[in-house]
Every structure is written in structure tokens, then in C-alpha cells.
Amino acid sequence: MSLDWMPREHGLKNHSRHTEQWWGTEAPCTVYEKRPLKDPKGNVVPGLYSAWIRLNNPGQYNSYTTEMVKGVIAGFENSSTDREVVAVVFTGTGPNAFCTGGNTKEYSEYYSMRPEEYGSYMELFNNMVDSILMCKKPVICRVNGMRVAGGQEIGTATDITVSSDLAIFGQAGPRHGSAPVGGASDFLPWFLSIEDAMWNCVSCEMWSAYKMKAKNLISKALPVLKDDKGNWVRNPQVYTDTYVKDGEIVYGEPKTGEEAKQARAWVNEKLKNNDYDFSLIDAEVDRIVWVFANLFPGCLMKSIDGIRQKKKFWWDQIKNDHRYWLGTNMMGEAFLGFGAFNTKKITGKDTIDFIKNRQLIAEGALVDEAFMEQVLGKPLAK
């Protein structure tokens, strides 16, 4: 018997939570666009898209301002319920940076010494991480340059990473006045060994894309530069043709001396002249999206959420506690660290005097303006 007698509604519902007010085209902003799905031959597939969320603040290495965070949230939450979207691609503008985290100028000049304000900001930041982890579409991180600090945290919240081989990865908090508790301390142990996770989280060392590929943090590291004959050139600043040297693993480690100096100059000249090509990365992103498109969407997302849940477990347990600590920290070490970094053009130094800081602590000194004056740099003579 037909069920035509049952009343049914057939118009499509709009489940989008946000309007276009959170996106823009002029830096600093978050750019949101839908790009047509293409098959392996480059043919456009009607009615299906990948959603691209791009951090657009290249003058400050794509650090996210408060308004940009809102744009990222809007992009992921709208993509999550957009029936036309197959996958989300999260990237940045230009060849230098995917994202270097929060905007230090904002942190230093506005949020430091305002713990409640920073707590409100962390509500947005936590929502941004959640919007990635909760997106009901696969999320690809297209790393176009350095993925550092908060940029590493939102990057490791994604599902798959395809990277420029010029990119570097790492944290910056303990050196500049914060702690990597916006995701890194929760996510890194799933990617790396516990000792690698510990050292990468606290040392503030920058590791190459090839080193991170070897250590399983990312899926692909691909070249973006060519020589004068049009041949692809792997990042010449790190070892890619040697795995072991004198008993030590050197693959992905930085070169030193004159060789490093020459390689750095060659890379910088290429980037200065905008002589780079992301076609290999984009082809790999397209390939991955096409794989996703040819899977059952419900089964795909159930599988992805099953993997994500491991990352989400500790993040969900302690993200609220982190919010309070980070707000309180804005009254002390964050004021010093972000302030030093933000005034480096004034003082010539981007960090405090760490040894003097520890000496004053050892003396039991009161942490007041006199204390801070002793550890911060001094304005250079004009």
C-alpha cells in the first residue's frame, strides 16, 4: 500500500547558522568560498563543492584577530550543514604562513592585564577548535607556510594535513608568555611519541615539514619551488636525500653553515619574487576530496568522528579549565612575553631577560612594575 496519504513537507530547510558578515576579502579577515568539485580529469561536477576557509592576514603571518576567529567559526559551522559541501579545506594566504596563532598585537595591547576580556576571547577560541572537531565534513589542512603556536593547534584539530615543504611546525607559548593548551597539549601525544610531543610542545623548536612527515604529524610534504629549468626542487634548507649520517637520523633536519646560508638566500629570493607553485599541493587536496566524494557520506563521517573522538576526549575534559588559567596568565607572564614580542622593533629584543626573571623569582621579589622593568628590553636610542 502506498504511503502517499501521509502528509509530508518537501521544501528544503536552511540549516546555516551564519551570514556572510563574518567573512571578507581585505586583510585582516577570514575568506570563505565554495569551489566546484572536480573529477580526476579536471571536469566540474555539478552541484557539489569543497568549502575553502582561508586565514587572510599575510602581513602578520596569518595570525587570527578576534574578528577572524568569528569568521573561522562561521565557515566551519555553515560548511557542516551545507548539503552541497563534500569537504572543507583550511588554509592561509600566501607562501609564508598557514597561521602563527593569535594576533600578538591584540594580545599585548588589549588583552594583557584584562583577564576577563581574554577569558571572553578564549570562549571564541575554544569555539573555533570545536567548530573544526565538530564539522560534519572532512577537514583538510592545506599548509601553505609555517604552522606555529595557535596555528599548530587549530591545524592539528583537522583530519588530514597536506603541506608545503617550506613549512615549519611548532609551538611558541613557553618562550613568549603562554602555554600550548589551546589544543597542542591534548592533540600532539596522539600524533607523536610522548617524548617528541613533550619536546615539541615546550621547547619552542621549529621542525620542518619533512621531519613532521617522518614523525607522522602530517600526511604529505610537497615542493613548491622550481629551478631555472622548471624542475621541482625539494626544500634545500633541510636534508631530504639522506636519512642517516654518522649514526644520527638527519632526514628533515636543518642544514648548517654556508650550505644553509646559500639555500636560505635562494628560497628567500624565490618567495620575494612570488616565484612559487602550489599546484602539487592543490592536486593532492583535489585527489583527497575526490576520494571523500566517492564514499558514503554517513559512513565516512561516522568513521572520521570515531577517530576525532580520541583527540576530543582530553580537549573536552579540560578546555574550560584552560580558559581560566589563560585569563589569569594575562596578568603576569603573558603581559611580559607578548609585550616583549610586540615591542621588538622598539627594543631590539623579542623576549624578556629569562635569566634575570628567574633570579628575581629566586629572590622572592614582588612581581610589580619594577620587576617587569628589569626583565623587559629598553627602548633603543633614536
UniProtKB/Swiss-Prot annotation:
EC number of this enzyme: 3.7.1.21
InterPro entries: ClpP/crotonase-like_dom_sf, Dearomat_hydrolase, Enoyl-CoA_hydra/iso
Top enzyme class: hydrolase
Biological process terms in GO annotation: benzoyl-CoA catabolic process
Functional note: Involved in the central benzoyl-CoA catabolism. Catalyzes the addition of one molecule of water to the double bond and the hydrolytic cleavage of C-C bond in the alicyclic ring, 6-oxocyclohex-1-ene-1-carbonyl-CoA (6-OCH-CoA) to yield 3-hydroxypimelyl-CoA.
Family listed: Belongs to the enoyl-CoA hydratase/isomerase family.
Record protein name field: 6-oxocyclohex-1-ene-1-carbonyl-CoA hydrolase
Source species: Syntrophus aciditrophicus (strain SB)
Taxonomic classification: Bacteria, Pseudomonadati, Thermodesulfobacteriota, Syntrophia, Syntrophales
